[in-house]
Amino acid sequence: MALRIPRFSQGIAQDPTTRRIWFGIATAHDFESHDDITEGRLYQNIFASHFGQLAIIFLWTSGNLFHVAWQGNFEAWVQDPFHVRPIAHAIWDPHFGQPAVEAFTRGGALGPVNNAYSGVYQWWYTIGLRTNEDLYTGAIFLLFLSFISLLAGWLHLQPKWKPSVSWFKNAESRLNHHLSGLFGVSSLAWAGHLVHVAIPGSRGEYVRWNNFLDVLPYPQGLGPLLTGQWNLYAQNPSSSNHLFGTTQGAGTAILTILGGFHPQTQSLWLTDVAHHHLAIAFLFLIGGLMYRTNFGIGHSIKYILEAHIPPGGRLGRGHKGLYDTINNSIHFQLGLALASLGVITSLVAQHMYSLPAYAFIAQDFTTQAALYTHHQYIAGFIMTGAFAHGPIFFIRDYNPEQNADNVLARMLEHKEAIISHLSWASLFLGFHTLGLYVHNDVMLAFGTPEKQILIEPIFAQWIQSAHGKTTYGFDIPLSSTNGPALNAGRNIWLPGWLNAINENSNSLFLTIGPGDFLVHHAIALGLHTTTLILVKGALDARGSKLMPDKKDFGYSFPCDGPGRGGTCDISAWDDFYLAVFWMLNTIGWVTFYWHWKHITLWRGNVSQFNESSTYLMGWLRDYLWLNSSQLINGITPLVCNSLSVWAWMFLFGHLVWATGFMFLISWRGYWQELIETLAWAHERTPLANLIRWRDKPVALSIVQARLVGLVHFSVGYIFTYAAFLIASTSGKFG
């Protein structure tokens, strides 16, 4: 018999229906389920795929550099970052009429172009790139790295170069390599680049390979380092009237702790950033020497973990068994990695706007909005991914005997308490927050706005004051204008930091009031409900009171057969599926809040947010409707402008989003009947019936149809908001 796809599973390949195709796609990356898989091949496949991922990333970033160098206006932007709009790439579209050609020809281009809202211009400028030649050089280098990564991936699948399973499970060596070799050395290299190339570039000195060894980044070179006078590197920083990229007001310091922002660029001082990366490098290089490897020196992670048994006995056997459990489960490791990466990505979103590291990015409002929203959505998907692989660990890899009475087992034993507490928190937040919003809406509707319940976020204001914000009048050390702490801080510790906190030209510690209090708790509701669904899915993955043998059915199952009513929708996959909706919902509230708060801040009418954000109609009318009206009116037979494409995407995103409900609401039986009717008609239609199929057409499983619906919902949701965000921001600020 001829070999049928999928080749990795002959069980699926023998299926006579179209399930063969869909199940083949669904399990293509589930290496553990493939025929003839061994532990060694499993690890080697994953390891090789990492190199493939790196190759894609390098190719993508190379493409960014290449297209900006070829079709962008980087050199013109460098001359005037405030007024030249950065170009991402040209548009060649045969559908464009003359009005569209004129609308999209901007930024000094000769034809239609897309603007760049990714911040790459500001990033490249900050790190010392100045010409198109620099961009081409970077593109070629990254293309080379992409090729090397592909080669490495292929090489590590060859018999001679395949690593052994013991190599993959050598946790101490891997930690040392990642901490010192990757994080430590790369942070040190980046600090070196900033000191040798970027900082001189910010002071009008163009450093490249031809003069790299001739230009000292500091007048005395390594002298202060070798003589122990490290403080000299911080002396004579650039002045407050320094013009970025020129010698005017430039200093000589290379490693400082100034705090605050460069007055012209409104970004962190490059010398502070270099100092930060040097410190990070030092910590990681030391951290990477901690664990016991070749020479028997250092800590054993297993020993440390197993020593953690609280003497009170309330955590049982503590961390015993965890080392082998984690080390032998790639799902556990992936879950930990995704959770960590998700948190970091969300932190990046928060810090990119509040502490901008790239020159002039703070004044590019559309880019600020796009980057914040992008990183928050990415963080959401990564975090929910962590809670997909956690349950898979519990189903496939968890060994109750190995983990008896340790912290992991005790989490499972206490799951009712954990789930019910999360449920209580979600209910409390939901009813109280919605109750306050609805009360305020009713008061507005009845013409008595003075009867709104408006709660000042006193505790949050106190925390801001403790960090040095003086607006609220709290008499605590860093915010008391006469106190010694404030004066000492200004003179000794981060002199620019306290000034930055109290300036209104940045996003540090924004002034907050009752509207912020309410939306904070709405977001808290979303976070707690998302967490409730995800944690419940993980803790019930092996079994529940309703279905004690759930683990025997795997990670996803539609229903577990006749005679067991009520067991649909309770697989761990279903919890992941439900949680993604709540995640999207929550990040919607987060990004709405961030965007509206900043639009009013940038336009100088913060009172609009303060007055309208305390009731739901205010959000619907003064944020969503007011900012989408340009898009709703954006496509007409008579008018074409640079927002027209966003108006089209706004419409298209709604359509994709709505399509999702077709798959989410109509389930398998409906589709099976429809398919059989269509197949019957096809077979009886002349000409059409000349085309036959080998596989009997059957409907998608419930789980697969839910996935199709979820993908449409997510993609449409994000496309809709992306179009709204970019158009409403760029329409106001250019």
Swiss-Prot record:
Pfam families per record: PsaA_PsaB (PF00223)
Protein topology in the membrane: Multi-pass membrane protein
Catalytic activity: reduced [plastocyanin] + hnu + oxidized [2Fe-2S]-[ferredoxin] = oxidized [plastocyanin] + reduced [2Fe-2S]-[ferredoxin]
Ligand binding ([4Fe-4S] cluster): 559, 568
Chain sites annotated for binding chlorophyll a B1: 654
Residues engaged in binding phylloquinone: 671
InterPro entries registered for this protein in UniProt: PSI_PsaA/B, PSI_PsaA/B_CS, PSI_PsaA/B_sf, PSI_PsaB
Keyword terms, alphabetized: 4Fe-4S, Chlorophyll, Chloroplast, Chromophore, Electron transport, Iron, Iron-sulfur, Magnesium, Membrane, Metal-binding, Oxidoreductase, Photosynthesis, Photosystem I, Plastid, Thylakoid, Transmembrane, Transmembrane helix, Transport
Membrane spanning stretches: 46-69, 135-158, 175-199, 273-291, 330-353, 369-395, 417-439, 517-535, 575-596, 643-665, 707-727
GO cellular component: chloroplast thylakoid membrane; photosystem I
Main localization category: plastid
EC code(s) of this entry: 1.97.1.12
Subcellular location per the Swiss-Prot or TrEMBL entry: Plastid, Chloroplast thylakoid membrane
Cofactor annotation remark: P700 is a chlorophyll a/chlorophyll a' dimer, A0 is one or more chlorophyll a, A1 is one or both phylloquinones and FX is a shared 4Fe-4S iron-sulfur center.
GO biological process, one term: photosynthesis
A GO molecular-function annotation: oxidoreductase activity
Annotated binding of chlorophyll a B3, by residue: 662, 670
Assembly and interaction partners: The PsaA/B heterodimer binds the P700 chlorophyll special pair and subsequent electron acceptors. PSI consists of a core antenna complex that captures photons, and an electron transfer chain that converts photonic excitation into a charge separation. The eukaryotic PSI reaction center is composed of at least 11 subunits.
Chain's role: PsaA and PsaB bind P700, the primary electron donor of photosystem I (PSI), as well as the electron acceptors A0, A1 and FX. PSI is a plastocyanin-ferredoxin oxidoreductase, converting photonic excitation into a charge separation, which transfers an electron from the donor P700 chlorophyll pair to the spectroscopically characterized acceptors A0, A1, FX, FA and FB in turn. Oxidized P700 is reduced on the lumenal side of the thylakoid membrane by plastocyanin.
Entries under PANTHER family matching the protein: OUTER MEMBRANE PROTEIN, OMPA-RELATED, PHOTOSYSTEM I P700 CHLOROPHYLL A APOPROTEIN A1-RELATED
Similarity field: Belongs to the PsaA/PsaB family.
Protein name from the UniProt record: Photosystem I P700 chlorophyll a apoprotein A2
The organism of origin for this protein: Pisum sativum (Garden pea)
Origin organism lineage: Eukaryota, Viridiplantae, Streptophyta, Embryophyta, Tracheophyta
